[in-house]
């Protein structure tokens, strides 16, 4: 996907819920972001709402419906998908105008940073989830492929939409359920316009290293010494106690 950059139109409308003013200073408590963009030549777009860095919902452009990040959200609120489709149509028209005015000048591409981690501490044979976190990139176009032992995996994979950052870059999460094993290795393969070659982030089970023999010997020796000291100290106290008792018996009652 090493292609030259193309213009991307991104509109970001930010609504901030703020605390009370203190000495004319305003502190943000929560932030809601409405993010939308239209992309050429892909002819794709996105419309979503974000609350404090977490997606609330996005609009599926193909199905023309609102998709809530959590089903429960849709029980307390509603959003008409047609409104988002109308916004994207405006974005497309504005993009065409800006492209002509800029003489087809491409935007500046920013390569992604990629991290692979697990959802929870790894235990062999216990189900877990691999997370591929793609961060700080622009434009919002990436192709992500999970590899298991070098072969593509598609079963059970899922992903988020493109999530906005306050610096107008993007982030995205991809997920792969898996069963940890010492025999399997995984890679998250990321392709982006700004990369000359696909970026691979590797993950495999890393068994805890056993203690060296010298360390084990030292630990055993320390344990033995502590045990002997405890026995000696205990014996001393017992002897002192017996001597005091005998001395008291010899003196007899006053």
UniProtKB/Swiss-Prot annotation:
First and last residue of the signal peptide: 1-25
Residues covered by region (Connecting peptide): 204-216
Main location, first listed in the record: membrane
Cellular compartments annotated: Membrane
Keywords associated with the record: Adaptive immunity, Disulfide bond, Glycoprotein, Immunity, Isopeptide bond, Membrane, MHC II, Signal, Transmembrane, Transmembrane helix, Ubl conjugation
Glycyl lysine isopeptide (Lys-Gly) (interchain with G-Cter in ubiquitin) crosslink, residue number(s): 244
One of the protein's GO biological processes: positive regulation of T cell activation
Extracellular topological domain residue ranges: 26-216
Region (Alpha-1): 26-109
Positions of glycan attachment: 103
Record's bilayer topology term: Single-pass type I membrane protein
Bridged cysteine pairs (disulfide): 132-188
Gene Ontology MF terms: MHC class II protein complex binding; peptide antigen binding
Parts of the chain on the Cytoplasmic side: 240-254
One GO cellular component term noted in the UniProt record for this chain: late endosome membrane
Pfam families given in the database record: C1-set, MHC_II_alpha
Subunit structure: Heterodimer of an alpha chain and a beta chain.
Family assignment from sequence similarity: Belongs to the MHC class II family.
UniProt name for this protein: Mamu class II histocompatibility antigen, DR alpha chain
Species the sequence originates in: Macaca mulatta (Rhesus macaque)
């Amino acid at each position: 996907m090493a292609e030259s950059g193309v213009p991307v139109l991104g509109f970001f409308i930010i609504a901030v819920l703020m605390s009370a003013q203190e000495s004319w200073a305003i502190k943000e408590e929560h932030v809601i972001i409405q993010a939308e963009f239209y992309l050429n030549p892909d002819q794709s777009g996105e419309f979503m709402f974000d609350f404090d860095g977490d997606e609330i919902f996005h609009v599926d452009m193909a199905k023309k419906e609102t998709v809530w990040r959590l089903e429960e959200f849709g029980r307390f609120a509603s959003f008409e998908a047609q409104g988002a489709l109308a916004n994207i149509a405006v974005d497309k028209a504005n993009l065409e105008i800006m492209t002509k005015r800029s003489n087809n000048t491409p935007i500046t591409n920013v390569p992604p940073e990629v991290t692979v981690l697990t959802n929870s501490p790894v235990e062999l044979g216990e189900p877990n989830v691999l997370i591929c976190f793609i961060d700080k990139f622009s434009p919002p176009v990436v192709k992500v492929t999970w590899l298991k032992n070098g072969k593509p995996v598609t079963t059970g994979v899922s992903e988020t939409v493109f999530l906005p950052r306050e610096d107008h870059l993007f982030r995205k999460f991809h997920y792969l359920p898996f069963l940890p094993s010492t025999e399997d290795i995984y890679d998250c393969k990321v392709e982006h316009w700004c990369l000359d070659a696909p970026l691979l982030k590797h993950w495999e089970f890393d068994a805890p290293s056993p203690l060296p023999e010298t360390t084990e010997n030292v630990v055993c020796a320390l344990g033995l010494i502590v045990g002997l000291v405890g026995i000696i100290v205990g014996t001393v106290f017992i002897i002192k106690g017996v001597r005091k008792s005998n001395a008291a018996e010899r003196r007899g009652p006053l």
